[in-house]
Amino acid sequence: QLILYIKTPTGQIKKLHFTSDLGSEYNRQPFVKSKDMVSSSNFSMFEATYNELGRGFNSKKECDKEREEFIKFLKDELSKNRSVLIGVFAQARQQSMMEFLYRNFKDDPNFKYPIYIDGVLGATLNNVYLSILEGEEKEYWQEVMSWKYFHYINSYEDSMSVALRKDETKIVLSSSGMFSGGRVVNHVKTTVENKNATIVICGYQGEGTVGH
C-alpha cells in the first residue's frame, strides 16, 4: 500500500492512503507482505474486485479445497493427453500461477509436461520480481523461474508455433487474462477448435470481454 503526504497551499499536511485489491485473507498470494494497519488518513482509496460478497473464500479450508480440486483437474486433463490454456494477467496472476504450479508439481515424479509462459510483459515483470525481492524470497523465485518445465516464449513466431501444436500435451500461461488481446488470442483460436484441449479462466472477467 501507499501513503502520500501532500502539503496544501495553506501549509496543511494531508495524508492520502491507497491500497491495492483487498482480496481475501484466506487466499494469500506468494511474495505479498502482511498488511500494515493504517490508523488514520484524510483520504483513503481501495481496490476491492476480489472482496465482493460471494467472490472470496469464507475459510482457509474452503480455499485449500479449491486449490486441491484445481490440481486434481490439471492432473486429470494432462493424463488424458489434453492441452490446458490458462489465461493470466501479466502482473501478479502469472507469477502466482507459476509459483502455484511449481510448488505442487516440482516433486511429482509423474509430471513431465512442458509449461509455456507466453507474453513479453509477463517475462519483463518476472525479472522485476527478481530485482525487488530479497533474501530467501529472491532465491525461491529464482528457483521457480528456473524450473525445467517452464519454457519462455519470446517471439511471435514461437508463440504461433506452440499454438498450432494441437496434439502436444502441455500447459500454456498467456495474457491477457480476459482473453481480449495479446498472444492468448491465438491460443484461444486453436484451443476452441481442439476437442482435446481445455481453457481455464482464473480471474475476474470484465463485462464486454471475450472471457466474460
Residue ranges and their predicted role:
Residues 70-212:
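Hard-cation-handling environments
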Residues 1-109, 114:
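His/Asp/Glu-rich metal-coordinating catalytic cores
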